[in-house]
Regions:
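Extended, highly charged
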Residues: 1-202
Length: 202
């Protein structure tokens, strides 16, 4: 089945997984984001191992009852296997590389709109008096030795201080304080690395 016209966002992606047998498990049982949440996923979704590469095509999970974060859900493992990604794109697993090449050759150009964006319905600013990342984001601490809670698929929008060119990159982001995140930048590997180097010089 071709899902490419159906999937518009995370919600519709999860709906496709709900309709695919064995690809999504949802729970309302309370879990602690401190090591417990990832521990449950390790056994349900990853077959009891975190060794790479995992050969188990276990289900993605959605936790609807995260301790300390009422009315917030956490999705984990949505892109954890090539087969699941292929299902979401409506292609065979072996065709993913070709699909990526096709998309790079014929990209969909962005549409600029001045209408209110759905993703901007709720906006939190660091200048808000009660702003606190620890309270706003149900980011899990995956092991007792982790540096802190991690947003594992965080998107970082950055702009070069000289050229004004911008880029969006995906990173694991560690919450360090109520208004600070840290990310690892490998020197020279991405545009954002050059942006950070230049910003550090200023």
């Amino acid at each position: 089945m071709d899902h490419r016209t159906e999937i518009l966002d995370l919600r519709t992606a999860l709906e496709v997984l709900r309709q695919t047998p064995g690809q999504l498990v949802e729970t309302d049982v309370e879990v602690d984001p401190e090591a417990e949440l990832s521990g449950v996923y390790r056994y349900v979704g990853a077959g009891g191992t975190v060794m790479r590469p995992t050969k188990v095509d276990g289900p993605a999970m959605v936790f609807h009852n995260v301790k300390g974060h009422p009315d917030t859900s956490v999705a984990i493992g949505v892109l954890a296997s090539r087969q699941r990604v292929a299902n979401l794109f409506g292609v065979k697993k072996e065709e993913l590389g070709h699909l990526l090449c096709e998309c790079a050759k014929d990209p969909i150009q962005p549409i600029v709109t001045h209408e209110p964006a759905t993703c901007q319905e709720v906006v939190h600013r660091a200048t808000d008096p009660d702003f606190d990342l620890f309270k706003l984001v149900p980011a899990p601490t995956n092991t007792p030795v982790d540096a802190g809670p991690y947003i594992t698929l965080g998107m970082c929008y950055a702009t070069h201080p000289d050229t004004g060119c911008s880029d969006v990159t995906i990173h694991r982001m560690c919450i360090q304080s109520k208004d600070e995140l840290s990310i690892f930048l490998q020197p020279g590997s991405r545009h954002i690395g050059a942006m950070a180097e230049r910003a550090t010089e200023l």
